[in-house]
Amino acid sequence: MVRKLKTHEQKLLKKTDFMSWQVDQQGKQGDMLRKFYVKKREHYALYNTLAAKSREVADLIKNLSESDPFRSKCTEDMLTKFYAAGLVPTSDTLERIGKVTGASFARRRLPVVMRNIGMCESVKTASDLVEQGHVRIGTKLVTDPAFMVTRSSEDMITWTKASKIKKHVMDYNNTRDDFDLMD
């Protein structure tokens, strides 16, 4: 017979669900969560499942015969989409898709791309700035740090017009216009 839980033990176990839990690689996943500053573990689990599914599809396409026109069309389409999303460095062979991991998806998050292009010093700072509404992509304001940035939209990442950070950067670079001072 099991004893009745004390009050503090019940409070600790209140949010624990013993019926459904995810089996994952705690050590490696924790490192990736810290490296890419992913706040929700479910997001990284989703990236891993997307990578696994894409590897499965790539393996299915590889199993088709070389002379099959469907194989060449699917290979070309899949490589084009993965290259446009920024998940593979070049779109030459199907083996590139076989090497896609959850980290490949995490590298395309907006804060990580901002750090890579030099807008911020760290991913954490970039994530905070995105959540506070300082960043836009094209004309669209983005406040979700889990936003996936494609290669084409990578060049359109800028500070919002009303952002104080943009004003400080323009003052530092001596590029602030008199017209901008009126805003």
Swiss-Prot record:
Cellular component terms, GO, for this chain's entry?
A: Mpp10 complex; small-subunit processome
Q: Give the signal peptide range.
A: none
User: Short name of one Pfam family for this protein?
Assistant: S4
Q: What is the name of the protein in this document?
A: U3 small nucleolar ribonucleoprotein protein imp3
Give UniProt keywords alphabetically: Nucleus, Ribonucleoprotein, Ribosome biogenesis, RNA-binding, rRNA-binding
Annotated GO biological processes are: ribosomal small subunit biogenesis; rRNA processing
Record's subcellular location? Nucleus, Nucleolus
PROSITE patterns registered for this protein in UniProt: S4
Q: How does it assemble?
A: Component of a heterotrimeric complex containing imp3, imp4 and mpp10.
What this chain does, per the entry, is described as: Component of the U3 small nucleolar ribonucleoprotein. Required for the early cleavages at sites A0, A1 and A2 during 18S ribosomal pre-RNA processing.
Identify the species of origin: Caenorhabditis elegans
Q: Which PANTHER family match?
A: 30S 40S RIBOSOMAL PROTEIN, U3 SMALL NUCLEOLAR RIBONUCLEOPROTEIN PROTEIN IMP3
Its main localization is nucleus
Q: Which InterPro entries match?
A: Ribosomal_uS4 (IPR022801), Ribosomal_uS4_N (IPR001912), S4_RNA-bd (IPR002942), S4_RNA-bd_sf (IPR036986)
Family assignment from sequence similarity: Belongs to the universal ribosomal protein uS4 family.
Q: What SMART domains does this protein's entry cite?
A: Ribosomal_S4 (SM01390), S4 (SM00363)
Q: Which residues form the S4 RNA-binding domain?
A: 108-174
The source's superkingdom equals: Eukaryota
Asked if Ribonucleoprotein is a keyword of the record, the answer is yes
The molecular function terms of the Gene Ontology recorded here are:
rRNA binding; snoRNA binding
